[in-house]
Amino acid sequence: MRSSRFLVLMVSLALVTLVASEGVKGNTEKPGVCPADNVRCIKSDPPQCHTDQDCQGIRKCCYLHCGFKCVIPVKELEEGGSKDEDVSRPCPESGWEVKPPGFFSTRCPQK
């Protein structure tokens, strides 16, 4: 009798643990890409968020300017693009201007 109660208790605890861990895993990533961050930091700021679910609306939890913050994401990557390129910048119009890193990419036509 005691062993059956113990078994029921253990099974119940296992089920509660599984259900609780599924709630934690349920954090989904919001659409969009974090903006490029080219800032070098001497010291990191305390995080304002840990996951996208900590942010309101469409904002994502991104590492930007020395700490994790809730920011508005840039557009989704276009097909063939690289995660490292900043898709929020427009493609250059002519070949004369100085282009920061990320401008020569698969999404901008070569001139």
UniProtKB/Swiss-Prot annotation:
GO terms for biological process: defense response to bacterium. It is found in: Secreted. GO terms for cellular component: extracellular region. Residues 27-74 form the WAP domain. GO terms for molecular function: serine-type endopeptidase inhibitor activity. Keywords: Antibiotic, Antimicrobial, Disulfide bond, Protease inhibitor, Secreted, Serine protease inhibitor, Signal. Its main location: secreted. Residues 1-23 form the signal peptide. Disulfide bonds join 34-62, 41-66, 49-61, 55-70. It comes from the Eukaryota. Pfam families: WAP (PF00095). PANTHER family: WAP FOUR-DISULFIDE CORE DOMAIN PROTEIN 8. Antibacterial protein. Putative acid-stable proteinase inhibitor. This is WAP four-disulfide core domain protein 12. It comes from Saimiri boliviensis boliviensis.
